[in-house]
Amino acid sequence: GHPIAHDRWPALRDRLAACRSIALYDIDGFAEGFAEIHNIADLPIGGVYVQDIARIGTRVLGHKAQPVTDLASSDADIVLVATFDSDRAASHIAHLLPEGAEMANLDEIRLPDEMLTNRRRYLDPINFATNFAFFRDADGHHTRLVTANYWAGYGAEGVALWCRLFG
């Protein structure tokens, strides 16, 4: 995950951890990949719900995937829609929420819009044109980074470089 998204995760995680039971709606199949990046093993996930009928009955995060239409009969006090750009998915299941349940989604941890090229489709590959550089600063050796603004060649304006150093 991106370091900024990682920095936003604790607030959502705390909100989920405070719940009695979470219904996880894995509409796009992101839940297991997300769980590999963010530790969710100790969250009170009461059930996993899917829309794709081919996934019903499969194991997702140790739970037998149930059809999203069964969501209303869960005892969850929060439904986590495990996707980005979740407005449409959330509106499609709003009538299925258990009584009194609130909804959460991964949009709560997304990068700020000013860092995105395509703000309408968060997971568009253009938003994550990422390069990694490993720097050395020891024993008289140093790394120098030189770059070029190739985005201008594609018509981009106001291009910025964002870096985060880890020590």
Language-model segments: residues:
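Hydrophobic, well-ordered beta-alpha structural blocks that scaffold small-molecule cofactor pockets
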Residues: G1-N131, F135-D137, A148
